[in-house]
């Protein structure tokens, strides 16, 4: 009877051992760096010329964010580098991150050229420390990041005594003041990072820092839904290209819209999986180009549908599709080119950072948090969505008018009086029109800043899931209908 008990205890021990996280004792997660790509030498690891003993390393199976949330990731080795040297966090754009986790933005060369330093005070000790003698942790940008000039806090710091700071830990001293940057009162160490283009001015008398205001996560299951959506996109395109009667102007516009949305979804997935190293910026501009193109195609489809249904001439001339192409691709190119020029001109100017589109900084796409998104994304999208709603309303009114006329004529012929009656096919037709004409995309215009309210937060979540499944909805409404299957059988 003892052997089964021993086996049971052994199995439990293995389970708890495998599921436990090998945290480094006495080390904060934000004081660690990923050293999975560094080989072990003489019972230590060499990280940026800093020798870290193996006793200060451990395996982690999670990633911790500034808001305290944890995401499971692949098991990797981390080292408590801040136990060896004082640390400073400097932001690194997504476009400069390499596959091994290093940042290739020329920071080392700039530090060697300008030789910047900061003053540290801990308890009663003060020291002037060059940044080249510190452990530099390259921090990433997040969705709600905000650029802050450090002198904005000086007036507040003057009211706080030095004794309060000394109890709290690290202080950054300037020649004409002091600024606390670590724990407990203003910002935790994970809530900020220094801006890269800081050291050619009057640093450290003043500096620009990036404040991480929030951490966003991809909604559970949305990545899987996007993959299924892309499969449905491919199937829908194949059906529209296979059936000759669907290769009219409307069908071609739908195919172009789906292709644009497919490329946008593909870049989004690759960006989330960190597979765009080396091509982050080109991928980000391409994503914006095809995002705006798909929105423009929805407006073209809305206009063309209204034009065809309300026109006595139902013939679709080929030149009309060529005009649509010229309008969509040129407009999308102008929109993308404008944000490219803005980024190139003011990318290194911290004072204008908050208003930049920041392609390749937060992710490989245009940022979507700040009033400036109304210039680059939300404003144009709202205008196009409003146009789509207007076209749908005019089309629906026309269909209702025609249906009412037909019902009235039928009732007069049969000698009876009846109210206008819409059957299920009519409602299904309205549903298809609302989807094809992009009626629902107006909810996607809600900025993330407005989603801090609980109601708009839920509207945003529902909209995100629905539009992640947009390809599935299109496939069901356009391909799985009876008329499409009949055309497929006849082809």
Curated annotation (Swiss-Prot):
Membrane topology: Multi-pass membrane protein
Gene3D superfamilies per UniProt: 2.30.160.11, Methuselah ectodomain, domain 2, Rhodopsin 7-helix transmembrane proteins
InterPro entries in the cross-refs: GPCR_2-like_7TM, Methusela_ecto_dom_1, Methusela_ecto_dom_2, Methuselah_N_dom, Methuselah_N_sf, Mth_GPCR
Record protein name field: Probable G-protein coupled receptor Mth-like 7
Molecular function, one GO term: G protein-coupled receptor activity
Family indicated by similarity: Belongs to the G-protein coupled receptor 2 family. Mth subfamily.
Transmembrane regions listed in the UniProt entry: 168-188, 223-243, 253-273, 326-346, 373-393, 435-455, 459-479
Biological source species: Drosophila melanogaster
PROSITE patterns: G_PROTEIN_RECEP_F2_4 (PS50261)
Gene: mthl7
